[in-house]
Design a protein with these regions (language model features):
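Membrane-proximal helix-turn-helix segments that form the acceptor-binding/catalytic region
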Residues: 113, 126, 138-155
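A conserved mid-protein helix/loop that constitutes part of the nucleotide-sugar donor-binding site
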Residues: 19, 23, 199, 203-222, ...
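Conserved acidic donor-binding segment of nucleotide-sugar-dependent glycosyltransferases
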Residues: 319-326, 333-340
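Aromatic "clamp/platform" in nucleotide-sugar-dependent glycosyltransferases that forms part
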Residues: 283
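Short alpha-helical donor nucleotide-sugar binding micro-motif in glycosyltransferases
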Residues: 262-263, 270-275
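A short, active-site helix/loop in glycosyltransferases that binds the activated sugar's phosphate group
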Residues: 150-175, 183-185
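Glycosyltransferase donor-sugar binding loop
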Residues: 41-45, 183, 204, 229-245, ...
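Short hydrophobic beta-strand element within catalytic cores of glycosyltransferases
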Residues: 300-304
Length: 388
């Protein structure tokens, strides 16, 4: 089975989309799926892309030119490369990741030109909050090309029932496969270090207006718990880090909040393991890979009902609260009031949940079944159906 996977960026700063896409490709390859991964090369100044192992996936990064002044991306070599690969594709499909970008429109154009099945994974970019954010740009793009591109896809991939319902609300009527992201298994921990110093509440994600960090600052300002600190880890986006730092200064919490910037690899896993509670007070999340990663490391999680994590309640491994300062403050108060042993027990319940339901091998098997069905080689899999 031959699949061309397309995505605009494999840079870590692109968040969960780039990481999930490369990990899915790596997990599909051992199942007999021949993957050609196409993305853009933004140059070494933008960072090191997240690449799947070369022995599993053939990855091509095509040069692009970006004008910050005009906010325009030009990537003619990308279109030529995708066109050439699509022309030679036999019995395969295109699986595109994301929306709005030049690469997404090119994938739809090429799929139509060669009459190839197109699967689109929006990765939460069509959630209501995301659609409202910078809507002055998105509304014209939706009317001009994005709606039609999505309508011509033969199948949409949602990572949760909540995201699937959002896609239906936009009038998209083709089949939807509901397959969550998988979770990378963290490396084995070393010997536990003795606990000294303050306990830690960790936020690890893009520092972006949609992540609710200002609510976290406000909630912490109300509580001001003794013996606790907050670590904010992740890349700055749209200059939002300056706004968060300003809020921290205004609340006189400079000595409590630490900003680490982007973290990857072993440093990321160490931050998770050092945390006593993980906090993601998001306005919009189609899945929330960082929630699953924290649980995989045995850390209880606080997140909002804008993320599809009702399992935090049903499996007693965290708090699933309404968006806003007051619900967040209440959840933080409850988490801080627990003993280390009680939080550890919740974290262990979360770790079991992730290992049982979110392994990449299971996720890849479900996606392969979807590919087979789209290509007419198998019956409809259970993950494709009506939105619950």
């Amino acid at each position: 089975m031959n699949v061309i996977v397309t995505i605009s960026s494999l840079l870590p700063e692109s968040g969960g989309t780039s990481r999930a896409s490369t990990q899915l490709c790596s997990a599909l390859a051992p199942l007999g799926v021949n993957i050609e991964l196409l993305s853009l090369d933004y140059g070494s100044r933008q960072g090191t892309p997240l690449l799947p192992p070369a022995e599993l996936v053939n990855t091509r990064l095509l040069p692009c030119h970006y004008s910050r002044r005009l906010r325009l991306l030009w990537a003619p070599q990308y279109k030529r490369a995708l066109t050439a690969q699509a022309r030679e594709l036999r019995g395969g499909l295109i699986h595109d990741n994301g929306v709005w970008q030049t690469t997404n429109h090119v994938a739809a154009l090429v799929a139509r030109k060669f009459n190839l099945p197109l699967i689109v994974s929006p990765h939460g970019m069509l959630e209501p909050w995301a659609m409202r954010y910078k809507s002055w740009k998105k509304r014209p793009a939706w009317d001009f090309y994005q709606k039609r591109d999505l309508q011509t896809a033969c199948l949409l991939h949602a990572t949760s029932a909540m995201e699937a319902r959002s896609l239906r609300a936009l009038g998209l009527r083709q089949p939807i496969a509901i397959i969550p992201h998988g979770v990378e298994t963290p490396p084995p921990p070393g010997a536990p270090a003795p606990r000294h110093g303050p306990r830690t509440a960790l936020f690890l994600s893009r520092v972006h207006p949609g992540k609710g960090l200002l609510h976290l600052v406000e909630a912490w300002s109300q509580l001001r718990p003794a013996g606790w600190r907050v670590v904010i880890a992740g890349p700055d986006e749209d200059g939002h880090c300056a706004a968060v730092r300003a809020a921290v200064r205004a609340a006189q919490l400079d000595e409590v909040f630490t900003f680490t910037g982007p973290v990857e690899g072993q440093s990321k896993w160490e931050l998770y393991r050092q945390a006593d509670v993980f906090v993601l007070p998001t306005f919009s999340e189609n899945f929330g890979v960082v929630v699953a990663e924290a649980l995989a490391c045995g850390v209880p999680v606080i997140t909002t009902k804008a993320a599809p994590w009702v399992e935090l309640q049903s499996h007693r491994c965290g708090w699933w609260v309404e968006v806003g300062t007051e619900p967040l403050a209440q959840a933080l108060h409850e988490a801080i009031a627990l003993s280390d042993a009680e939080r550890s027990e919740m974290g262990e319940a979360g770790r079991r949940l992730v290992l049982e339901r979110y392994s990449w091998s299971k996720i890849a098997a479900d996606m392969r079944a979807v590919y087979q069905w789209v290509l007419g080689r198998a019956s409809q899999p259970a993950c494709v159906g009506e939105c619950p």
